């Protein structure tokens, strides 16, 4: 279930910033956007309502990670917002992920974070004390996510083939850390171009600063969209 639109990370601090950014796009251009912690904590459910009124699709990226009952209750609230996709941390465990699925219901796509794309293998081993390879850790989390009945995972594009092999071809792989060729990588450790992510089998890509901080965001979006669709 590949999405042909790049998901734009709306990494802005205020609703006003989002309004100014989205106003640059034609009214009939329906986007897929990611609303993360900073923006949601600043603007609350109002940001969801505003973006949905414009007709855009929303990935609400809050990465819930708590005891199963708390996550279930939180997901029940989020289910009423009308988001198209949201997520949890796979590290919360199978029971927590099952509770999240139950609370959210069957409508929105529910995925789990494996290892953040800012995490290196050295950091994983030193801080998390996980003594496998980074790829093995990600694939393990993906298998547990599938076992819990979720729709897919957030992962680096580099791990997509192994995840598909270990789960199934319909298991969603949403990949952040996407940068056009020559763009600054910022705080991402495991990056890939849109065209390479397409070739390797990613289902969704998330792109932030190369679009939101571009001199012409609309042109940057269309360029990345063309690369993503191998045009």
From Swiss-Prot:
A single GO cellular-component term on record: cytosol
Residues that, per the record, bind substrate: 11, 34, 61-70, 117, 179, 188, 208-209
Listed SUPFAM superfamilies: Ribulose-phoshate binding barrel
Pfam family, one: OMPdecase
SMART domains in the cross-refs: OMPdecase
Active-site positions on this chain: 63
GO annotation, biological process: 'de novo' pyrimidine nucleobase biosynthetic process; 'de novo' UMP biosynthetic process
Superkingdom: Bacteria
Molecular-function GO terms, alphabetical: orotidine-5'-phosphate decarboxylase activity
PROSITE patterns: OMPDECASE (PS00156)
Keywords, sorted A to Z: Decarboxylase, Lyase, Pyrimidine biosynthesis
Pathway, per record: Pyrimidine metabolism; UMP biosynthesis via de novo pathway; UMP from orotate: step 2/2
Catalytic activity: orotidine 5'-phosphate + H(+) = UMP + CO2
Record PANTHER family: OROTIDINE 5'-PHOSPHATE DECARBOXYLASE
HAMAP family: OMPdecase_type1_B
Assembly, per entry: Homodimer.
Family: Belongs to the OMP decarboxylase family. Type 1 subfamily.
Function: Catalyzes the decarboxylation of orotidine 5'-monophosphate (OMP) to uridine 5'-monophosphate (UMP).
Name of this protein: Orotidine 5'-phosphate decarboxylase
Organism in which the protein naturally occurs: Streptococcus thermophilus (strain ATCC BAA-491 / LMD-9)
